[in-house]
Amino acid sequence: MGGARKPRTLAEKVWDDHVVVAGQGYHQDRGPDLIYIDLHLVHEVTSPQAFDGLRLAGRWVRRPDLTVATEDHNVPTVDIDKPIADPVSRIQVETLRRNCAEFGVRLHPMGDIEQGIVHVVGPQLGLTQPGMTIVCGDSHTSTHGAFGAIAMGIGTSEIEHVLATQTLPLRPFKTMAVTVDGRLPAGVTAKDIILALIAKIGTGGGQGYVLEYRGSVIESMSMEGRMTICNMSIEAGARAGMVAPDETTYEFLRDRPHAPTGKQWDAAVAYWQQLRTDDDAVFDTEVYLDATSLSPFVTWGTNPGQGVPLAASVPDPELMIDDVARQAAEKALAYMDLRPGTPMRDIAVDAVFVGSCTNGRIEDLRLVADVLRGHKVADGVRMLIVPGSMRVRAQAEAEGLGEIFITAGAQWRQPGCSMCLGMNPDQLAPGERCAATSNRNFEGRQGKGGRTHLVSPAVAAATAVRGTFSAPADLN
């Protein structure tokens, strides 16, 4: 008889439930496990070569019922009833449509009520569920970990492997507990928490880990907030981020199109309730954040870890002890055209972008509307508000949010990845500075020569009104 099973973390439980064939060997010499994949999400940018590989090998999609595609990265956010102007974008979208038709994959194209950013669509349809393994050819697949799933981005060759076999060979990841306790101050959001965490541990601090977010602040957070935090786990270098499912999770999923019903719902919840880290389980490492000490955050550099509280100033590289950090800061400040010691609140912006798979959900749009109500976007500032999906847009319209945005002088767009990345018409001009609710501030991310600062939706809205980096409290 075997001994009692050792206590396990949430990630280990989900992983163990999906091992088809265990890797051979021990410790460092152990081979990868073959992991079953419950849900495969597909979009137009990373899938064409994968479908070509299937075609050349004479294979088919093994589980089209577990594969869902949507158009998001390249799609325009205006005039969606007209042909896509950019030839490369048009070819990629048309190719996805042909591939999905040929291989029997469900697709939500532009204009479809269920179309939107892939990481918004999955949860809103109830496709994303606790205990699942979820993959997509996109870094921010970690978003779905907010439901207690192991969710990760994969490359094109791995996409082909999943399409053909519904499995992936993977080595187990290390585990990191990120505990956020304390009382979250007014005006501080999930986006501020994750930006503060990345600033604390660095963009490589989570490399090789699955991060499990825990603590009273996470437990009291909405699903939208949890998705924001898990979404940016990859920006700390992590493979995935997770939150244990609870009543908040169940209520979000209840009655969604693909959620279980009746006795199947009861059985699913009974299983989901087991998806918690055992009391005696040991993480490979642990990190703590005191929420009470947090404040609105803004990045100043060219990676998500180069951030400071809004009340702070641009840091001085000369005061940095680490040579690598100092050189990176000097390079970033040169690109961003910023001087050390400049108060963040004194930095003017040319554009404000609200949207993306990080902050394009209805809760985010409500926050923005609350700030914009009764105000106008500052002269010389261009503000784009892009819902994460057609469903989000419809709900925002029903709640009167679109009217608030337009009255304030913002552009209220159709769904898509939009200005998060320069793969569609929504781009910055060289030298333009943008406050963005997206997830990456790399050089040229929003367009060649564009300068991106990552902020929360609330800070984005206040910044649009004042024209310089601001919090809602600054408008009073």
Curated annotation (Swiss-Prot):
Its EC number is 4.2.1.33. It is an enzyme of class 4 (lyase). Its cofactor is [4Fe-4S] cluster. It catalyses: (2R,3S)-3-isopropylmalate = (2S)-2-isopropylmalate. CDD domains: IPMI. Binds 1 [4Fe-4S] cluster per subunit. Heterodimer of LeuC and LeuD. This is 3-isopropylmalate dehydratase large subunit.
